[in-house]
């Protein structure tokens, strides 16, 4: 419901984003389990197991996972599904910052959201927290460079 708006605002702020619905490589665009079988709701666990590593599913997974590796931050836009939650958990485990934006009318309380960096309920607050984190990360990188003398006048 809010996906396109959030994506547009982040792009307008000059953030490079990954749009899983419209990736740059259009051949990988629009993966859906329904592409493999018309009635996935009737699948048994065994049916799912057999299709989990279908070439189309594997290509889509690799595309998404590559984007996760390349990302600096993750925005978990609520409400969302299991895949988004798995991605956010993996990214946090990799030490990346994860911001939750909950635009639902009635939130579903979740204790594990405490592990993430911020829980916002307004898009403007999300943008501010990303900007603050970006600036903080830049400062830390600058300090690290200066600490190792790679940016000092002595090396010129």
Residue ranges and their predicted role:
Residues 1-156:
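Conserved catalytic or regulatory cores that recognize and/or transform ribose-phosphate-containing ligands
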